[in-house]
């Protein structure tokens, strides 16, 4: 019966004799399809009924989603109710066509019905991470220019991600600071640098681990003697993880307020008890800056975007740190043609967030421009258009409209902000945002109003309007 079915759905015998692929069993064909781009798979599906059935199979598209988004996102989606009744092929289409976000307010100490003692005080330039199903918040700067040294955690229940309770933990924390970086590597947090309220720049490295019942333990990481290479003290730099046990640090504000343009990589030991720094040597280097972002997009590539440069100008350039071999790193600039992007003028920013989300794209939110006007917009940078290898030192030119997309926002709109912090959950579909600088009431003799914010809200990637049964896009009907 199987042989007869194959004959019925295959081209005539003359074609069979000239195309060996027709005689391949289905499991071999599926293996080949997994090596092809999605467009090629869709073209393959249009050749005959048998190939259409193969190319539309749920097992193939589940594997494609895992290939494109990573196994962590796919595993998280399997546990959620989002996929109920939907195939993986439809899920892929929804993520690919995603063009809007929905913001959900979770907590705000300014609300009359909230007890302020149960929340972290308003702050900016802190750190916020998602690790082991917990949000972890540390440090930052607050009213009066004071630094903070507190650590807060909140368990995120997969069944109800919009109800969270903060808990202040005693953890033997690092000294107070703001403008530091804190990244997730496996089940660990890695914190570096920052500035204290005496204006001192720091270059210490701490490693933290979250335990059950929201416990957290910090310890100073051993990076060798003072004679060993290490980054100079700094704050307002950027950092991200790369590979399995490496942290990349770039730029920031160093001693005497000088903006830096150097790049360093910290490689952790197998047991996470120590690390070794080395400085990246590259023919091309991004200009010095602070308040920018680094986002890991692949095991061997990091994206740098924006920040404030030497002349206090706010930047919109994009660079790729390409690591094809250990200690063979190179920076490559990505050039865009923005003629077809009318809203491009709003892209330059500093103090924004840039987070890798579901679909393998970078979600950029907020920040401020050269005039310190804070933003509330969401942009997506589609890094799938950037090759994973073969990048040339002279850079790469791409069509801006195929790479950048401004997203619509549905329902609740958070205040415009800068120097907030954001992190995504395991699925990459939900983004948590806390704090930052927001516009406040204009004070007497002040040129502008400015205040620290203590709001926590969740940003949801909208995968089709059916996700929001009772909400509508402004100006459009469901």
From Swiss-Prot:
Span list, region Disordered: 1-20
Q: Where is the F-box domain?
A: 18-64
Signal peptide coordinates: none
Where are this protein's Kelch repeats?
135-187, 246-299
Give the compositionally biased regions (Low complexity): 9-20
Q: Quote the InterPro entries the UniProt record gives.
A: F-box-like_dom_sf, F-box_dom, Kelch-typ_b-propeller
Task: Write the record's keywords in alphabetical order, separated by commas.
Answer: Kelch repeat, Repeat
In its UniProt entry, what is this protein called?
F-box/kelch-repeat protein At1g51550
């Amino acid at each position: 019966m199987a042989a007869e079915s194959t004959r019925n759905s295959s081209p005539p015998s003359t074609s069979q004799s000239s195309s060996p692929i027709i005689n391949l069993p289905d499991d071999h064909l599926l293996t080949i399809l997994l090596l092809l781009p999605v467009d090629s798979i869709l073209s393959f599906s249009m050749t005959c009924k048998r190939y259409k059935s193969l190319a539309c199979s749920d097992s193939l598209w589940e594997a494609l989603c895992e290939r494109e988004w990573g196994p962590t996102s796919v595993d998280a989606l399997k546990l959620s109710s989002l996929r109920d009744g939907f195939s993986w092929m439809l899920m892929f289409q929804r993520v690919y066509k995603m063009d809007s976000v929905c913001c959900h307010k979770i907590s705000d100490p300014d609300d009359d019905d909230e007890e302020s003692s149960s929340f972290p005080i308003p702050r900016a330039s802190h750190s916020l991470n998602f690790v082991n199903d917990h949000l972890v918040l540390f440090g930052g700067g607050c009213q009066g220019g004071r630094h903070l040294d507190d650590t807060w955690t909140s368990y995120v229940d997969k069944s109800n991600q919009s109800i969270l309770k903060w808990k202040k933990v005693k953890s033997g924390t690092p000294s107070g600071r703001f403008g530091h970086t804190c990244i997730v590597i496996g089940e660990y947090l890695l914190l570096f640098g920052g500035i204290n309220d005496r204006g001192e720049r720091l270059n210490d490295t701490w490693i933290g681990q979250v335990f059950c019942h929201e416990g957290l333990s910090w310890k100073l990481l051993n990076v060798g003697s003072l004679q060993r290479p290490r980054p100079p003290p700094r704050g307002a730099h950027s950092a991200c993880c790369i590979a399995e046990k490496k942290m990349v640090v770039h730029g920031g504000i160093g001693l005497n307020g000088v903006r830096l343009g150097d790049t360093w990589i910290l490689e952790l030991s197998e047991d996470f008890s120590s690390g070794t720094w080395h400085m990246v040597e590259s023919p091309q280097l991004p200009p010095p800056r602070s308040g920018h972002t680094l986002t890991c997009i692949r095991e061997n590539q990091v994206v740098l975007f924006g920040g404030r440069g030497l002349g206090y100008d706010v930047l919109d350039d994009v660079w790729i740190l390409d690591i094809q071999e250990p200690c063979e790193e190179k920076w490559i600039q990505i050039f865009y043609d923005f003629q077809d992007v009318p809203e491009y003028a709003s892209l330059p920013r500093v103090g924004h967030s840039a987070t890798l989300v579901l679909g393998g794209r970078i979600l950029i939110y907020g920040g401020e421009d050269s005039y310190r006007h804070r933003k509330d917009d969401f942009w997506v940078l589609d890094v799938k258009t950037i090759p994973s290898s073969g990048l040339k030192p002279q850079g790469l030119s791409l069509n801006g409209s195929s790479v950048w997309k401004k997203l619509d926002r549905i329902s609740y709109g958070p205040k415009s902000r800068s120097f907030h912090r954001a992190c995504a959950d395991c699925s990459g579909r939900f983004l948590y945002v806390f704090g930052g600088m927001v516009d406040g009431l204009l004070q007497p003799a002040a040129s502008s109003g400015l205040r620290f914010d203590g709001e926590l809200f969740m940003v949801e990637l909208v995968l089709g309007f059916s996700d929001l049964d009772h909400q509508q896009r402004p100006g459009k009907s469901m």
